[in-house]
Amino acid sequence: MIIIEKIKRGLIVSCQALENEPLHSSFIMSKMALAAKMGGAIGIRANGVNDISQIKLEVDLPIIGIIKRNYNNCDVFITPTMKEIDELCNEGVDIIALDATFRNRPDSVSLDDFFKSIKKKYPKQCLMADISSLDEAINADKLGFDFIGTTLYGYTKSTNGLDIADNDFNFLKTLINSNLKSTLIVEGKIDTPLKAQKCFEMGVDLVVVGGAITRPVEITKKFVEKINQVKR
């Protein structure tokens, strides 16, 4: 696919802001994406059709699109149903990322059936699997996802609190050694340039960084926390 050729190696910046954050604005996210491009980013990850449409007016970079939507009594919220897929496809998104964990989906459809339904309706759409474990990555690879991201490692009940850098990046090493056919994208808790560099040194070609670049409230808190540790 052409999009895979355009997004071969480099940094992808996730430009997202939650509703309770000061930068929650499609206009601001579009400017954040422009700043990311000016800094050398080769792609953008964005949430919601409004943000994505505004970002497309500012940059011509490939976009990984998601829609975060909560459903009752369901932990899956990243592009969880065909409704979100339809919205993203109608907008025209280069890559759609979705939760590819083994957790129950809101409509009780299995991931396998969901993937097949998407491919039947949108056969040319590139898809990214957001996973949290090796078994989920292997399953996504067998299904035929174009990309597999470590997005949810550390964010599910079974991996809560884990960091991609734990044990000298052991989880990432395991994924790399699994010889996945899908292109691997490292995402989640890549909060320093050195962590990103380490991923590339290990052989990964695509890394997504979000909060460390685009969430000034959280960045400020980290500085303040360290400063406040100094006792006088």
Curated annotation (Swiss-Prot):
Its EC number is 5.1.3.9. GO terms for cellular component: cytosol. Keywords: Carbohydrate metabolism, Isomerase. One of its GO terms (biological process) is N-acetylmannosamine catabolic process. Pathway: Amino-sugar metabolism; N-acetylneuraminate degradation; D-fructose 6-phosphate from N-acetylneuraminate: step 3/5. InterPro entries: Aldolase_TIM, NanE, RibuloseP-bd_barrel. Gene3D superfamilies: Aldolase class I (3.20.20.70). Belongs to the NanE family. This is Putative N-acetylmannosamine-6-phosphate 2-epimerase.
